Amino acid sequence: MRNIKMPKRVLQGVVISSKTDKTVTVKVERKFKHPIYKKFVKVSKKYAAHDIENKYREGDKVSIVESRPISKTKTWVVVNVE
């Protein structure tokens, strides 16, 4: 059996909270066309991401990448600021 690794997902979003130690909350928005109404709908979701150096603040545009589970809710790591 081959060991083929799947590529990790990368998302872009805005930091909306950096109050916790080594964790930021990132809001990721996506747009899609509604299948029935044919109107573009904007949906957002919040992710808890690991920030090991506590250097990101509210309002920063960041990229997050999928990783192993770090805690109960954290499975994303901040990789860079846009």
UniProtKB/Swiss-Prot annotation:
PROSITE patterns in alphabetical order: RIBOSOMAL_S17 (PS00056)
InterPro entries assigned to the protein according to its UniProt record, in alphabetical order: NA-bd_OB-fold, Ribosomal_uS17, Ribosomal_uS17_bact/chlr, Ribosomal_uS17_CS
GO molecular function: rRNA binding; structural constituent of ribosome
GO biological process terms held by the UniProt record: translation
GO cellular component labels: cytosolic small ribosomal subunit
SUPFAM superfamilies: Nucleic acid-binding proteins
Alphabetized UniProt keyword annotations: Ribonucleoprotein, Ribosomal protein, RNA-binding, rRNA-binding
Domain of life according to the entry: Bacteria
Similarity comment text for this entry: Belongs to the universal ribosomal protein uS17 family.
Classification via PANTHER family: 40S RIBOSOMAL PROTEIN S11 FAMILY MEMBER, SMALL RIBOSOMAL SUBUNIT PROTEIN US17M
Protein function: One of the primary rRNA binding proteins, it binds specifically to the 5'-end of 16S ribosomal RNA.
UniProt subunit comment: Part of the 30S ribosomal subunit.
UniProt protein name: Small ribosomal subunit protein uS17
Organism listed in the record: Rickettsia typhi (strain ATCC VR-144 / Wilmington)
